[in-house]
């Protein structure tokens, strides 16, 4: 089970977007990276294709998982993630507050 999943609210810990929060759009476990909405935005030059015109587009670039942390459900501050067996299900738990992260 992954500690950071698609749809999680995360806080950026280091880099040019330090302190920003966003939602995880995509997780790439093999590369240990994630794409977060509104974070690590880069400009790319786009060549013209049949269905897209040329120009400079902005998009989110992947950020390393070590540079982001899940936002605590209680106060929104960064927290580490632990696991707990709840009945017969394994759930993610915020180490900071003890709240269950999984909906």
Swiss-Prot record:
BP terms from Gene Ontology? translation
This entry's Gene Ontology molecular function terms read: rRNA binding; structural constituent of ribosome
Which InterPro entries does the record match to this protein?
A: KOW (IPR005824), Rib_uL2_dom2 (IPR014722), Ribosomal_uL24 (IPR003256), Ribosomal_uL24_CS (IPR005825), Ribosomal_uL24_KOW (IPR041988), Translation_prot_SH3-like_sf (IPR008991)
What domain of life?
Bacteria
A GO-annotated cellular component = ribonucleoprotein complex
Assigned keywords, A-Z: Ribonucleoprotein, Ribosomal protein, RNA-binding, rRNA-binding
UniProt xrefs under PANTHER family: MITOCHONDRIAL RIBOSOMAL PROTEIN L24
Instruction: State how it assembles.
Output: Part of the 50S ribosomal subunit.
Q: Which family does it belong to?
A: Belongs to the universal ribosomal protein uL24 family.
Its biological purpose: One of two assembly initiator proteins, it binds directly to the 5'-end of the 23S rRNA, where it nucleates assembly of the 50S subunit. One of the proteins that surrounds the polypeptide exit tunnel on the outside of the subunit.
The protein's name is: Large ribosomal subunit protein uL24
Species: Sinorhizobium medicae (strain WSM419) (Ensifer medicae)
């Amino acid at each position: 089970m992954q500690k950071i999943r698609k749809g999680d609210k995360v806080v950026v810990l280091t880099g040019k977007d330090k302190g920003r929060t966003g939602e995880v759009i995509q997780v790439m476990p093999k590369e240990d990276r994630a794409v977060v909405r509104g974070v690590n935005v880069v400009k790319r030059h786009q060549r013209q294709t049949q269905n897209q015109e040329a120009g400079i587009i902005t998009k989110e670039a992947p950020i390393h998982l070590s540079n982001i942390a899940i936002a605590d459900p209680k106060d929104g501050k960064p927290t580490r993630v632990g696991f707990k067996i709840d009945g017969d299900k394994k759930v993610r738990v915020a180490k900071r507050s003890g709240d269950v992260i999984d909906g």
